[in-house]
């Protein structure tokens, strides 16, 4: 089935916005570290790689899925994306971006008290913003149960979180409390790039997340494959490729993303072997095309993300586990310097 012309046009527009968000966020960090005057010589930082892994998801969320009553807690390390989006929406100024992480500039992490743009939740300490969305949703239900604000539409309380934020104990306390109180209208979107400050995430962790959330009454949506990968899986030999992707360790996948198409080709052919149709699937693509296919994880595919968001037509809590690449779209994607 061919996509409708309007859908294709919308995706093209969103792709252009995604490119602008990634560029602005990366430029903001680069300017703070390498262009702006630095009198003490200290590194400013800014988490370019962590921002890049969420650029697609945040583009889909802010420019397609959000409703006026929704509120969002942005993971701290994606603050540059947030400021870039607010700039494109006319709610942030260029001088604030140029003074990112400086006095009276855009803040390192979204702040309701210090930022000029439209911050819903301060998320300066990892894990706290995530829990805030859950308790805000419970508070919304409490207020409505007492007869206040019923004329206003209900909002979804949405958290954008890094996979390593799920190491924070307060998150699990919140999940338990949500189950006790009948949590509704809460989305948690996990940026599953499988890298943290000092490590690659343990294999199979997503399955434990999935079981945990489902046991506490959440729906779980895993967004693993992008449109290119899904189309390739439908080709002869595609199922073998999908099985290889599912078996591939996180550390190896990260290394191959950085090494590029020739490395992908060698590893795939060495491990899958000459099996006719799947070999043809690989060999008919150039190195550039093969790298694009293998890097096309669900969290970087606008169509896949939008399908996941649009597919929710209920008020049950939802956890989206979106596979992403740290530093996606930047030269140092998955280079192994996990905290760059």
Over which residues does each language-model region extend?
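Short glycine-/polar-rich loops that comprise or flank the Walker A/P-loop
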Residues: 155, 182-186, 217
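Cofactor-binding active-site loop characterized by glycine-rich and histidine/acidic residues
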Residues: 9, 13-21, 25, 29-39, ...
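Active-site flanking residues adjacent to catalytic metal/cofactor-binding acidic residues
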Residues: 161-164, 190-191, 322
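Short internal beta-strands
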Residues: 71-75, 185-193
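Long, well-ordered, tryptophan-enriched scaffold segments
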Residues: 5-7, 192-339
């Amino acid at each position: 089935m061919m996509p409708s012309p309007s859908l294709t046009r919308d995706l093209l527009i969103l792709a252009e916005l995604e490119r602008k968000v990634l560029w602005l966020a990366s430029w903001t960090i680069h300017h703070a570290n390498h262009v702006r005057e630095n009198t003490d010589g200290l590194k400013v930082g800014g988490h370019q790689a962590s921002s890049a892994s969420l650029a697609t998801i945040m583009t889909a969320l802010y420019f397609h899925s959000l409703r006026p009553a929704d509120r969002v807690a942005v993971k701290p390390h994606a603050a540059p994306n947030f400021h870039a989006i607010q700039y494109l929406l006319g709610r942030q100024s260029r001088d604030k971006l140029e003074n990112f992480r400086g006095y009276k500039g855009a803040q390192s992490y979204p702040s309701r008290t210090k930022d000029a743009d439209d911050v819903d939740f301060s998320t300066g300490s990892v894990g706290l913003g995530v829990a805030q969305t859950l308790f805000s949703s419970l508070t919304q239900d409490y207020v409505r149960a007492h007869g206040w604000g019923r004329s206003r539409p209900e909002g979804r309380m949405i958290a954008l979180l890094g996979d390593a934020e799920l190491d924070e104990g307060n998150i699990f306390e919140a999940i338990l409390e949500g189950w006790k109180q009948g949590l509704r209208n809460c989305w948690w979107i996990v940026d599953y790039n499988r890298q943290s400050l000092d490590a690659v995430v343990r294999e199979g962790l997503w399955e434990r997340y999935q079981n945990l959330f489902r046991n506490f009454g959440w729906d779980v949506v895993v967004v693993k494959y992008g449109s290119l990968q899904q189309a390739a899986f439908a080709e002869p030999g595609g199922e073998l490729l999908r099985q290889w992707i599912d078996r591939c360790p996180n550390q190896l996948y990260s290394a191959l993303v950085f090494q590029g198409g020739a490395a992908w080709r060698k590893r795939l052919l060495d491990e899958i072997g000459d099996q006719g149709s799947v070999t043809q699937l690989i060999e008919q693509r150039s190195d550039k095309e093969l790298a694009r296919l293998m890097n096309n994880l669900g969290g970087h595919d606008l169509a896949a993300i939008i399908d996941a968001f649009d597919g929710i037509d209920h008020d049950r809590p939802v956890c989206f586990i979106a596979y992403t690449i740290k530093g996606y779209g930047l030269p140092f994607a998955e280079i192994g310097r996990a905290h760059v």
